[in-house]
A protein has these predicted regions:
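The feature represents the first ordered module of a protein
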Residues: 1-62
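Short, compact, well-ordered microdomains
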Residues: 68-93
């Protein structure tokens, strides 16, 4: 499967927290996802991933808040980024 990296960013939030965003464009959708993006957006605090949006093959689009996994309705890459940053803001406040 061919893939093209669209976004690979790391944002330091503070001394003990960072955000990592990786988005790939695939030649065909992953099993469980209707779109051609493969993504992982994560908030890591004190070395622990406390928030993550991803779409691993077979599971489809979902998010992890703490240890809880919740289905996520993917609309577009921009909405995905907005939703993720909104969750990061909630986590931090």
């Amino acid at each position: 499967m061919n893939a093209r990296l669209l976004l690979d960013e790391r944002h330091v939030i503070d001394d003990d927290a960072f955000v990592e965003i990786v988005i790939w464009l695939l030649s065909s959708p992953l099993a469980g996802s209707p779109h051609r993006l493969k993504y992982r957006l994560a908030l890591v605090v004190h070395g622990d991933c406390v928030l993550r949006f991803d779409n691993e093959a077979g599971k489809g689009d979902h998010k992890h808040i703490g240890k809880k996994e919740i289905p996520y309705t993917f609309i577009s890459s921009q909405v995905l980024l907005n939703d993720f940053w909104n969750e990061v803001d909630k986590w931090r406040h």
